[in-house]
Amino acid sequence: MIIELLTPEPSAWDAASVLVRAANYAASLVAGGAALFHAGFSAQMRQADSASVRRLAAGASAAAIALSVAALIVRAGVLSGGGGILEARVWEAMMTSRIGDAFWIRLAGLLAIAALATRITVAPHLAVAGALAVAASYAAMGHSMLYRPRQGIAALVVVHLACVSFWVGSLLPLARLARGRDGETVAILADWSRIARPVVAVLIASGLALAALMVRRFDLLYATAYGSGLSVKLLLVAVMLALAARHAFVLSPAAARLEPGAGNRLARSIRLEAAVSLLVFWAAAEMVSIHPLDAGHRIAA
């Protein structure tokens, strides 16, 4: 949005698309992450905490479905300049393109995640599959379809976003659990931390690999505003990593020792990390709106 508004002839539709895209990233990946958290830790959680995670997954899924529809409307506005937003030809062209493919994949995934709100026996399994489908939907369009190696970039996008989803989607449930003062809560926090470390390592490795594949030469990094968006995103991720390190090495051990107020301090810091993640999603949305300079790896239309 900000990058668009700084152009000589800014488009309100393009600016709106960045905002909607960022919100959609947040809602859909939180939904998927909550589903993954529920699958991994529901057996250890109290019933009330497990129900809270299911509500988060279902609520975020509903929000993401609404935002996905809003994204289509805004995209129609971008394609038509706003004048033909309701024209059938615009929607036909859009829904028969990769935009439509991504929408239907994401919708199927979000509906599967929303099954956690029901008493269906297989709902947790459907939700995990849905989380992976949501991650895959973002590889069905955008940069992963425009640059070589297409299959490699698409695979990295799915892996990267699945890891992002697990990390970010776990934050609100962890903040709720951090306020507890019992052995079960401490065990869940410790178990999550052990799993999260390799997940975050894969997240970082896949993200750096994607950056290297998209920007083939360092001297081309700032040839377009893509490099600025990438730099801001990396800075914000570094802030999240610093907060996560503080949780793992300072606040969580204090909570495990049941120090007075330690759980509340941990919960507040986790919520701050969740807030920073929203800025990461905004930076990612800005990046996707800009193409890196073609270094011979752009796929011809």
Model-derived features with residue positions:
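Polytopic transmembrane helical bundles with strong interfacial aromatic enrichment
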Residues: 1-301
